[in-house]
């Protein structure tokens, strides 16, 4: 990215169903004010200048799923200049590691949110919402699609 003031650039992603040839939707980065609710940036479509790593450190390797969320939230809290692009920068096939480990992702997102969010109850509230959504999704899949 040519603008030297931009330290992190996040773009859009085309989302594909498994083995599909056409995307079924485009995911856009959300406004940065959404950090307390979950990751607003699309990790695979995000580029970070080397100087940012020198300034705020690397990803937290103790986090299996949410290391990217923690890093970007830390960057945001340290006033790193984060910009969005409307361009699709990557194609993603659904069913990745986060999708396959929703409970761990929800737990780690709560941990990260608790560390950085100024409203300390919000990460726990969002964690509860994610868990309820996951339980409903599992119930619907098992009862209406016959999966076990």
Predicted regions and their residues:
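Conserved donor NDP-sugar-binding/catalytic core segment of glycosyltransferases
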Residues: 1-23
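Accessory recognition modules or surfaces
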Residues: 32-33, 37-38, 96-105
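Membrane-proximal basic amphipathic "stem/tether" segments
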Residues: 114-148
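Catalytic core of nucleotide-sugar-dependent glycosyltransferases
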Residues: 88, 92, 99-124
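Short glycine/serine/threonine-enriched helix-capping/active-site loop
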Residues: 9-13, 85, 92
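A short, conserved alpha-helix in the catalytic core of glycosyltransferases
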Residues: 40, 46, 52-57, 62-91
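Feature marks short, surface-exposed loop/turn motifs that line or immediately flank catalytic pockets
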Residues: 15-19, 91, 98
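A recurrent flexible, glycine/aromatic-enriched loop bordering the glycosyltransferase active site
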Residues: 16-23, 29-51, 55, 70
